[in-house]
Every structure is written in C-alpha cells, then in structure tokens.
Swiss-Prot record:
UniProt GO BP: adhesion receptor-mediated virion attachment to host cell; symbiont entry into host cell; viral tropism switching; virus tail fiber assembly
Disulfide topology: none
UniProt protein name: Tail fiber assembly protein U
Induction of the gene: Expressed in the late phase of the viral replicative cycle. Expression of late genes is activated by the viral late transcription activator C. Expressed alternatively with tail fiber assembly protein U'. The switch from S-U to S'-U' is performed through inversion of a DNA segment called G by the phage invertase protein Gin.
Task performed by this protein: Chaperone involved in tail fiber assembly. Remains associated to the tail fiber and participates in the host receptor binding. Binds to the primary receptor. Two alternate tail fiber assembly proteins U and U' are encoded extending the host range of the virus.
Metal-binding recorded as keyword: no
Other comments on record: The orientation of the G segment is defined as G+ and G-. G+ orientation provides S-U fibers whereas G- provides S'-U' fibers. S-U and S'-U' dont have the same host range (e.g. respectively E.coli and C.freundii).
Keywords for the protein's UniProt record, in alphabetical order: Chaperone, Host cytoplasm, Host-virus interaction, Late protein, Viral attachment to host adhesion receptor, Viral attachment to host cell, Viral receptor tropism switching, Viral release from host cell, Viral tail assembly, Viral tail fiber assembly, Viral tail fiber protein, Viral tail protein, Virion, Virus entry into host cell
Family: Belongs to the tfa family.
Protein source organism: Escherichia phage Mu
Chief place where the protein resides: virion
Keyword hit for Chaperone: yes
Length: 175
C-alpha cells in the first residue's frame, strides 16, 4: 500500500518537466522522499481507499480514485477497502494515526473551543425561549406556567454563562 508524506510543490527536476512548466504552468508535487505525485498517482490500487490527511493527521479527503486528488500540503495513504475504514469521513472528526483510521483525538485547546461553541449555542437557544416569555410577562399576558418557565430558563441561562469551558459541566436544560 502506498503512502506519500508531506506532498509539496517544488521546482521541476528534469528538462521535460521544466518545459511543461514553462509551456503549461504545471505545478510539480513531490513527497518528502522525492517521489513525483503525477507518476505515483498511477501506482495506487483500484480496490483501496485513498485518504488525504494534514500535518495533524486529520483526514481532509477520502476517495477511491487518487487521480481526483490535489494533495498539495498534505499526505496521501491508501488503506484496505474494509468496513472499519469506510466508517471514516472528511468531517474533521477522523484521523489517520499509527497506520489506522481512528476517531479524532482533540487537543485541550480544541476541546475548549468546542465547549465555547456549545456554550454560545446553548445561550442562544435559551435567549430564543426567554424573549417571548419576557414579552408575555411585560404585557401582562403570561400564564403562571409561562412565568415559571421563564424563571427556569433564566436560571439555566445564568448557569450556562458561568460554565468554565476549560472543564465544562453543563447544567440540566429546563423542560
């Protein structure tokens, strides 16, 4: 199975390549071990999955046809077309690590960013519930049930706003 690492654009290495670059603006892609992508792409097997991954091992593309890839700035590996490998996608939630496709392992910073996004989404959801209830109270149109619901959502909103995204513990959402 082929594995081309750290593919980057570099200068042509032969007179023929130089001429192609001069005439057609060809960009030459080379792996870290000096292999030419355009020659190697034909050596991938037809019955395998080709995975493109970045410098952090995050999968950014998956295909059966290597000729459809533009791997500049990435690495490409072919893996067996088996069920365990077919579960991966290019959503950013999978990685190629130690020769296998695995669920992505997030760094502490990435986990905190995800928690911050979740916090913002939960606060937005709470505000969308709170606003019409506040309006009903302000206009003296709220039922006792709506007043109680408003209070529980406001309490929830305050608790969410206090969540430490470095170590999140999310409060129970009101019903």
């Amino acid at each position: 199975m082929m594995h081309l690492k750290n593919i980057k654009s570099e200068n042509p290495k032969t007179k023929e390549q130089y001429q192609l670059t001069k005439n057609f603006d060809v960009i030459w892609l080379w792996s870290e071990d000096g292999k030419n992508w355009y020659e190697e792409v034909n050596n991938f097997q037809d019955d395998t999955i080709k995975i493109v991954y970045d410098e952090n091992n995050i999968i950014v593309a998956i295909t059966k046809d290597a000729s459809t890839l533009n791997p500049e700035g990435f690495s490409v590996v072919e893996i067996p077309d088996i069920t365990a490998n077919r579960r991966a996608d290019d959503s950013g939630k999978w990685m190629f690590k130690d020769g296998a496709v695995v669920k992505r392992i997030y760094t502490a910073d990435e986990q905190q960013q995800q928690a911050e996004s979740q916090k913002a989404a939960l606060l937005s959801e709470a505000e969308s519930v709170i606003q019409p209830l506040e309006r009903a109270v302000r206009l003296n149109m709220a039922t006792d049930e709506e007043r109680a619901r408003l209070e529980s959502w406001e309490r929830y909103s305050v608790l969410v706003s206090r969540v430490d995204t470095a170590n999140p513990e999310w409060p129970q959402k009101p019903e």
